[in-house]
Amino acid sequence: MKASKEVTPRPLSAEQQLRGFIARFEPKQQVLIRSVRRALRRRFPSAAELVYDYSRSLVIGYSPTGRGIDSVVATSSGADGLRLFFNQGPTLPDPKKILLGSGKQTRFIWIESSRTLKLPEVNALLETAIDRAKIHFPPGGHGKLIIKSASAKKQPRRRPKR
């Protein structure tokens, strides 16, 4: 009689985990999250991508250090859509008044498509946020994808059916 070998599953890579987190969104939202992520990766190639999987949202921060507090921008995806947060939002010049929110540290804009990131007023905000960052991004290299937290309680990230 052969002894049965118990196969221990290999832990998922950070990229595989992120794909799983994104898969819980509606298909249209999945496409948006991936396209915005690609655009921000191009914009911040040396940034650490910090992923926080909360029960009602998926947050991806772009940090020069790997610490969330140092993130320059972050996306937050939920059933209501995708927002781009600027960590020093209240201090950023916003002549077109596109920044929303009233917090002491952040402001955000709604992202309808990755093309939103190419708008001159959004580009200006991104440039200023980069220039004003307390810690600057490394000039070269490729940042890592880091799963910072994953919620134990998983809830669907789709709009409730009416």
Ranges and model annotations:
Residues 1-162:
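Charge-dense, helix-prone N-terminal extensions
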